[in-house]
Design a protein with these regions (language model features):
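Cytoplasmic-side transmembrane-helix entry/capping segments in multi-pass membrane proteins
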Residues: 2-6, 63-72, 120-132, 153, ...
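Hydrophobic/aromatic residues within transmembrane alpha-helices
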Residues: 22, 33, 88, 114-120, ...
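Hydrophobic transmembrane alpha-helices of multi-pass small-molecule transport proteins
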Residues: 45, 111, 120-142, 195, ...
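Specific transmembrane alpha-helical segments of multi-pass solute transporters/efflux pumps
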Residues: 50-95, 101, 137, 220-238
């Protein structure tokens, strides 16, 4: 579980850099990319889930509770966190977005304390305080009189923090009854359908170059499909709090690659 969550964080950090390149340098629209990457990732994961479990992947539709759970997980978690992350990157950069995303540990800790009566341990408190200090330095650069990032980035960052918490908490109950691949696949498909309604694939189509195509393929199959498969699988083995804490590999990866590539 620890390895799965750590690898997911690393791949997400790499995907953040690919997103920054596509959105800021190549002006690919966030809405177009969301629909395409989620739909193709969903088909990839559904194919894998069917290979592993066959017709069992359709058992989720026998329970209204499970259907509702997948829809909520998609909108408020899996799809929501990808969209708010992309918008935060669009208004700032991958490093800023991933650092803000780590603050999702705060609502997860409060949720665990209230619902499961699990108070944070010393390591969790240290991680929480460090995340808060880091976020404050990021947003203000140590000054009480000015913001170092745009207001749009802060607003989307708040939604990013909340959807990251949803991404960690909402699938836990579903994973008690269903395969992680199946849950990820259906939630991804719901998100893809929603964003195709918002922004159909034939509108604002980018001009494809080898660099754009390679970044898109990486973002779709590694940064989305594989990353979410690993993260949701980790939730089957470790707690949501532990998985979210291990997501700190994401900002470290993004910051390092951002420095090496864009500086």
């Amino acid at each position: 579980g620890v390895i799965y969550a750590s690898l997911a964080g690393i791949f997400w950090g790499m995907a953040g850099i690919a997103s920054e390149y596509l959105f800021q340098d190549q002006h690919v629209t966030v809405y177009w990319m969301m629909g395409v990457k989620m739909s193709l990732s969903a088909l990839t994961l559904l194919g894998l889930a069917y290979y592993l479990d066959g017709k069992k992947i359709f058992l989720v539709f026998k329970s209204f509770k499970d259907i509702l759970g997948i829809v909520l997980f998609s909108i408020l978690g899996l799809a929501g966190v990808q969209f708010t992350y992309s918008m935060t990157v669009n208004y700032s950069n991958a490093t800023v977005a991933t650092i803000i995303q780590t603050l999702g540990i705060l609502p997860v800790i409060f949720y665990s304390a209230i619902i499961f009566k699990q108070l944070p341990g010393r390591k969790q408190w240290i991680a929480t305080i460090t995340a808060l200090i880091g976020a404050w330095l990021l947003v203000t650069k140590g000054s009480f009189n000015q913001l170092a990032i745009s207001k749009e980035a802060i607003i989307w960052g708040i939604f990013l923090m909340l959807t990251q918490a949803g991404n960690s908490v909402l699938p836990v109950d579903l994973l008690r009854r269903h395969n992680p691949t199946t849950i990820s696949a259906w939630a991804m498909l719901v998100g893809g359908i929603v964003f195709e309604f918002i922004h159909p694939v034939w509108k604002s189509v980018p001009k494809f170059t080898p660099a754009i195509t390679l970044n898109m393929l990486f973002l779709i199959f590694i940064g989305t499909a594989l990353s979410y498969y690993l993260f949701v699988k980790s939730l089957h083995l470790i707690s949501a709090t532990e998985a979210t804490l291990l997501d700190t590999f994401e900002p470290l990866t993004a910051a390092l690659l951002d420095f090496l590539i864009f500086k």
